[in-house]
A protein has these predicted regions:
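Short, structured coil segments at secondary-structure junctions
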Residues: 54, 74-77, 152, 156, ...
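Conserved donor nucleotide-binding strand/loop of the catalytic core
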Residues: 77-88
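Short aromatic/basic micro-patch
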Residues: 36, 117, 150-151, 182, ...
Length: 212
């Protein structure tokens, strides 16, 4: 499988991105998507990651502190939807986002808004695998550990919306293990989220990932 560093083609089976930004940020004590980083906010870095590879259909799912995030998204020209049930957890935001994907979407990424260190090259590898193999789920892994974002075929949308069991998206995708492809990536950023003030201080300055 060969992938290059050029922007991925989106003309056949368009690919979308869901950014999950509805959570409480309870351990951070601040609104995580609005934390300053690299001269921007964290949410702007995450949005820019998808723009970098040519994904035009990016949808941000909001909930807690939506009023603070909306001006940033409007400035970026990015679409958003508000999950009124965000207190029910991240999977409720996944479902809200999936409900609002544009018709004709071939596959979609799901990335929490507190993970700004994923590399564009990783996304390109996942898209390349999707184009070449036609499976249902593509999961990046680094040194044997699965990370974010998965790339999920739109064929699983009905199953996602119908799922009522425990464990959320991870449990649902595990039920389709035989249709999953794990893609090796030289990218520790797929494992790094900004969950606590200590995480933010640790990665704010010393961690300088290649975005490509």
């Amino acid at each position: 499988m060969v992938c290059n560093s050029q922007p991925v083609r989106m003309d056949d089976q368009p690919i979308a991105a869901l950014i999950l930004a509805a959570g409480f940020s309870s351990r951070m004590k601040m609104v995580k998507p609005l934390l300053p980083m690299e001269g921007q906010t964290v949410i702007e870095l995450v949005i820019g990651l998808f723009q970098m590879i040519g994904i035009a259909d990016t949808l941000v799912v909001l909930g807690y502190a939506a009023d603070q995030l909306i001006p940033v998204l409007n400035k970026q020209g990015v679409s958003y939807v508000i999950n009124e049930d965000y207190r029910r957890g991240m999977f409720s935001s996944v479902c809200k986002g999936v409900e609002h994907l544009k018709e004709g979407c071939g596959a979609f990424f799901v990335l929490p808004a507190d993970m700004p260190f994923v590399r564009a090259e990783t996304l390109q590898k996942l898209v390349c695998a999707f184009r070449e193999t036609g499976k249902a789920v593509y999961r990046p892994h680094y040194q044997g550990r699965l990370g974010h974002p998965p790339l999920i075929s739109a064929t699983l949308i009905p199953a996602i919306l119908a799922f009522k069991g425990p464990g959320g998206l991870r449990a649902l995708l595990a039920a389709y293990e035989e249709r999953c492809v794990d893609v090796a990536c030289d990218d520790p950023g797929i494992l790094i989220d900004l969950d606590t003030p200590e995480d933010y201080q640790k990665y704010r300055f010393p961690y300088k990932p290649s975005r490509y």
